[in-house]
Amino acid sequence: VLWAQGAATIDWLSDENLTTVNWRTTEASSASKEASAAIAQGDTEAFEALLPQRQPYAAARDEAAFKLVRGVILEGQIDATHPLGYGFTDEVLPMFRRSANFMARSENAYSTPVLYSATPLLSGYMSAENQALASGSASLIVDARGKGAVVLALDAVTFRAFWWGTQKLLLNALFFGDLLEEPR
């Protein structure tokens, strides 16, 4: 079992073709990618149409801060029948979150043992756009590869050893790693 934690690690694994992940993106990020594609094709009209509206410089810092996700608690829904869910008795699992990256659910219906609820924010501040991205997104994905598996985890399940509720996920990956296969 390979436990991959954090967006940068997951991106690297994806770039090296060791796993596959689909990211949910903000409207601004999608527009930026479309604008880059338009300029690469020489379509300046499409490029101009995709550029964001001009904003006052003084507002930049505040706007950027509102888009951050720093220390929120989100409502995860765990599949207690999954090997990573062993020992959990409640379907609701509060997850500590420090990142504004969100993964789409796995293409395999059995490989997303923890996903966020429809209204995930339990505590802290999160922009409406990030709440919409988090809604129904994956917190953990198991990607079976050959005789092993890669566990993709965006959240720090053992964050500073004070977030006790989710530490079992990591321990279950260690103890039940041989059971982490993708049912087809």
Question: Positions of the model-derived regions?
Answer:
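Extracellular ligand-binding/catalytic regions of CAZymes and related secreted enzymes
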Residues: 81-83, 87-101, 105-184
